[in-house]
Amino acid sequence: ILFDTRDADIGGAGSPAARRLQALAAPLDVPPLEPLPKDHVLTRSFYLLTDFPGRYANSPLWVEAAPPDAELAEGMPFRNLNDGVTPVVIGGNDWAAAWAIDENGMAMFPVGRGLAGERQREVSYRFGVNLIMHVLTGNYKSDQVHVPALLERLGQ
């Protein structure tokens, strides 16, 4: 599930949007969260990304925290729960507004300024693609580090 508070995290945990999110999520079994690690598969499920902007660009992205006893594979935490798919993503960059288009295919909301804003919108689309690829395919990208060993085992 993706929670987008659309507030750019300006107010932090005490903002009305954050309090509303806490109230909505209270009955859910939300796992412990952490800011998205730089090595998380969501950063490379299709596009290689370091930022995850929407209409806003500075809100942190939160995902399920790796278990403290997570195995290390190639120096990176190996998330073996849910095939490596985080069950929850939380941010406040207003991705839906960045992705929204009208019946003529024109952007409905401004993003950034000038060409920098259009680049921000493009990266926002890329984040959306990465998110969907991550949801649909799990951790297949992290499995790629094991391909040489698998081919060796198969005698290839």
Task: Write out the residue ranges for each language-model feature.
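Short, surface-exposed beta-strand/loop micro-motifs that present aromatic residues
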Residues: 63, 69-81, 85-88, 102
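Extracellular ligand-binding/catalytic regions of CAZymes and related secreted enzymes
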Residues: 104-156
